[in-house]
Amino acid sequence: MKEILVLCPFGVDKGLLSKAARLSSGELRALVPAGEAETAAEYGAGRIFELSAPEIGDESAFAAFLLETIRRWGSRIVLAPATVRMRNIMPMLAWQLDAGLTADCTALRMEGEQLIQTRPAFGNSLMADIRSLSEIQMATVRPGTFRPEKQAAKTPDVQTITYTPDERVKLRSFGSFAQGKPLSQAEIIVAGGMGVGSKAGFEKLEALAKKLGGSLGASRTAVEAGFVPYRCQVGMTGITVCPKLYIAVGISGAVQHLAGMSGSGKVVAINSDPKAPIFDYADYGIVGDWEAVVDKLLKEENL
């Protein structure tokens, strides 16, 4: 039986649960924050552990708590979203469990009882299939990789587990610098490339994203130029997204970038170069000065 445990202590990853439900031939188990059991059940979890915790605090202490929980449940495949905090916690668990861990996967499949984990390698020049030889197989999955799909209705087994952090170590606050929804959850993304040309240009794109109720994205070259922070990067070395609408502004359309937004519903490209590869991928294209187009959209009252 391929029983899979998905660790989502900081928020349900609907896409990852959907994929795990399809992979599992046994019961899909999930650890989720208090109050999110119903959502986890909708996306395939049959046995749900709601985490009651006033705060998580020190990650090493929380990892020790999760370690005992995993051992008690006995799952042989453990998955988690590759968020900032789970990227720290999963290696601690893998070391204690003497398990193989593949980080930042972009695809998963089963061959018998073996989990095949796919991730970019050698500077994103190829995709590597990885098999873990350990008894417990572990992987983190890039957020937004899998499209959320609701599963057949079922009545889940829900249990509450309580975590009390060491009172000697307290997390005073945990803030997010992100504007709007995280990219992996955004339904509308306005993304810019090197063609935008400056931080000031990206401020205009961010204003448009806010007007549309979306989030700001960027190509790797724009991030490396210092126009926007890494959290905005879409692509093989950034975040994989699947919004309903993706507006690509001044983005040429490199393969690495396209791989990160291939799950988008509709793609609108704005570029002054009519031969830009992004137009081959877009549903709608506008050839012209991006700033003039964006200025008109910002002035449009009916958006």
Regions found by a protein language model. Give the residues of each.
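N-terminal glycine-rich FAD/FM-binding segment characteristic of electron-transfer flavoproteins
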Residues: 1-303
